[in-house]
């Protein structure tokens, strides 16, 4: 596809699409049934507001908002949170700091 690498780390890589990011990583788990998605992420300006909306809609938040730093090249400081979608998929909200 000709995408440039935005960041990489052991077991993962982010590709720059021009107006977004595609993250690919090895999660070490068994394959999902055809048509299922295990994880996807949304970039947002306000992770905490997204979590409030998720809770209000009645969905499970299983990683509360927190600040992290992915040891990628270059390093990636971010605020993240995870919830479960209606089909059990993991939905990540993140904001680069």
Feature names for model-found ranges:
Residues 5, 13-14, 31-32, 72-73:
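Short secondary-structure boundary/capping segments
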């Amino acid at each position: 596809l000709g995408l440039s690498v935005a960041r990489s780390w052991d077991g993962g890589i982010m590709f720059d699409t021009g107006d977004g990011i595609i993250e690919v990583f090895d999660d070490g788990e068994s394959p999902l049934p055809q048509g299922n998605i295990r994880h996807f992420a949304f970039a947002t300006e306000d992770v905490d507001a997204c979590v409030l909306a998720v809770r209000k809609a009645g969905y499970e938040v299983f990683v509360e908002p927190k600040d992290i730093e992915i040891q990628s090249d270059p390093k990636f400081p971010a605020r993240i949170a995870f919830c479960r979608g209606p089909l059990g998929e993991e939905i990540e909200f993140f904001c680069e700091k």
